[in-house]
């Protein structure tokens, strides 16, 4: 099989151009300085949570706290089409269900789905493979609760995108029932940073120094293991994948390399690149038209594969 490559997004209106420039500038000024290796992890977590309040969760989407096995989750939406296990980003050292409510609530509403956002353990307090173990336990708990795998999906952004891929590989290797499909937004799939550029024009959030810090905090000397860097693992026999990334982000190369690797794998995959968009721009759903279009693509992908 091969990985189908597509260009996402639509020609922006003048208003959308102004909005995009404003959002990009806000990220560069307010968020990027917090993602410095010398910033205390507690500050990074607090700052990310505070800035997430500037996003717009979908209206009328219920949420409640519950658990899947031993893993706390925030259950978003109560749709009946299927269930998504969502693994948030944050470099394995920050992020939480609250920081990703805009993305997860709009996804739940669009797809008529329930989205279970795992509040997995973070590094450096809980290094590799704690996050992967929690994702694994949460997925198995969904199966134990009677969720049919053909009505399940796994999704994640950034570190959570890499975690999504690593979880699929572990489930496949164990012979566990695989979900119907998976979504990955700007996935971080190679923690060795062997081919990560120093920077890219227009990068609004991340920098290589912080990625090095986060990779070391999470995986230490195991950064080249498939569980931490799933790009280096076996990609055969995985469920259908949808990968979305922006052109203006330092991790775009991870998605490009993943698409190339999937060309030679026994896996059906689609890779959508959104020109002029930044890292996990889908977090601006409800404001940015391209974010809404991207999540509509996710809805269609889920409905195509859920049975």
Spell out what each predicted region is.
Residues 1-76, 307:
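A glycine/proline-hinged amphipathic helix-loop "lid/cap" segment
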Residues 26, 65, 69-74, 78-307:
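Alpha/beta-hydrolase superfamily serine-hydrolase fold, recognizing
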